Regions:
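Extended alpha-helical regions
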Residues: 215, 219, 225, 248-255
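N-terminal entry module detector
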Residues: 1-61
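Long, highly hydrophobic alpha-helical transmembrane signal-anchor segments
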Residues: 19-20, 28, 49-95, 135-160
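Membrane-interface segments at transmembrane-helix boundaries
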Residues: 4-18, 56-76, 103-142, 187-206, ...
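Interfacial aromatic "cap" segments that immediately flank transmembrane helices
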Residues: 18-37, 128-158, 183-223
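Selective recognition of hydrophobic, aromatic-rich stretches within alpha-helical transmembrane segments
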Residues: 49, 53, 86-121, 162-194, ...
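Hydrophobic alpha-helical transmembrane segments
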Residues: 13, 22, 35, 47, ...
Length: 255
């Protein structure tokens, strides 16, 4: 499978997820609870973000005096660049707000997403059907919860560094891309965990399928430009990611 095919497959992951969930009552029910949580969080973010922008900006400026000086310089000396800087800054804020809400939803919805992915992989023939798979589901859910909490610590450290880098001229371009890749990997990680991939195998899968993750990251960024849309669509990304993972794995197994 060519790199361009992988890229397109990654780009259309959410639409694969929509089709899967909307055409299966069982998958729909598994996605419904975290989806309702996502809708609630999305509405809350949409309202709070646009009604408290001034307060949020004041807090940022008080916390980072050097940023205040930087913005005063840009706004005072080069008004056009200042406007561009402010626009990019708010894009950055929206992306990171969505990212942290995504982490919260992953933690809350981990048991449902684990079972959702497991059902899809069984349907695609990558997992053997098990009549009483409650123990496996419970084990996978707890393991994914622990992994998610561990990744939360790592990602919070990384996002703190990215937050500082974002105020560098190239940072406002690189940060959304990196955030997109981080979330793209996390969406596929449910499938990798169900297949019992080791850390080395997960890293190898990521590096050997960069075109697929690039398409998926781009789809995530597209959905992120409308506040709340990505959090509402998260079950579709995870379900579509599992289906795409199965498709790629089976295609590579036959070549």
């Amino acid at each position: 499978m060519s790199s361009s095919t992988h890229f397109v497959k990654g780009l259309f992951v959410p639409f694969r997820g929509i089709y899967l969930i909307m055409t299966s009552f069982q998958l729909f029910m598994l996605a419904l609870i975290p989806l309702l949580l996502a809708i609630g969080v999305g509405i809350f973010l949409l309202v709070s973000l646009w009604t408290n922008t001034a307060t949020f900006m004041e807090l940022i400026l008080e916390w980072l005096p050097w940023l205040h000086q930087l913005m005063q310089f840009r706004l005072g000396d080069i008004s056009l660049l200042g406007m561009i800087f402010q626009g990019l800054f708010w894009i950055f804020v929206i992306l990171f707000t969505i990212y942290f809400s995504y982490l919260a939803l992953i933690i809350i919805g981990a048991p449902f997403y684990s079972l959702l992915v497991d059902k899809i992989l069984v349907r695609r023939g990558l997992q053997p059907p098990v009549q009483n798979n409650f123990i496996r589901w419970l084990y996978t859910s707890l393991k994914m919860l622990i992994i998610t909490l561990f990744k939360l610590v790592i990602f919070m450290t990384a996002t703190g560094l990215l937050f500082i880098v974002s105020f560098w001229s190239l940072g406002v371009i690189l940060v959304p891309i990196l955030v997109g890749f981080m979330i793209a990997y996390d969406c596929i990680d449910f499938s990798l965990e169900c297949m019992n991939y080791s850390l080395r195998e997960r890293w190898n899968y990521f590096t050997s399928h960069l075109s697929f993750f690039s398409g998926l990251a781009l789809a995530i960024l597209f959905f992120s430009f409308i506040p709340g849309l990505f959090t509402i669509s998260l079950p579709f990304f995870i379900a579509g990611g599992a289906d795409a993972f199965a498709s790629i794995t089976q295609s590579e197994a036959t070549t």
